[in-house]
Regions:
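Motif-centric detector for short Cys/His coordination patterns
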Residues: 1-82
Length: 82
């Protein structure tokens, strides 16, 4: 089952606070993604882009633009529970 995201909030240091429908809250650190995935480097180099994180219409993906998205199952699995 693909987890649905209730809300996403960009934080400092390229971290996201994500709340899932079933009540789990996690902090997901994008530092490694920015370092390892070419498209994600725009989150660091384009001023203000990281703060524009939003949910797609299915609420199963955080998106920034047409090239950068992050699936909810990745966030759910690798995010740190808070």
């Amino acid at each position: 089952m693909i987890p649905h995201i209730k809300s996403v909030e960009p934080m400092g240091d390229f971290k996201l606070f994500v709340r899932f429908d079933e009540g789990k809250d996690v902090v997901y650190d994008l530092s490694d993604d920015i370092r390892d995935i070419a498209a994600f480097q725009e989150l660091k180099t384009l001023p203000g882009l990281f703060k524009n994180a939003r949910l797609d219409s299915s609420r199963t993906c955080v998106v920034w633009n047409e090239r950068i998205d992050l699936p909810s199952d990745t966030i759910y699995e690798y995010g740190v529970s808070v």
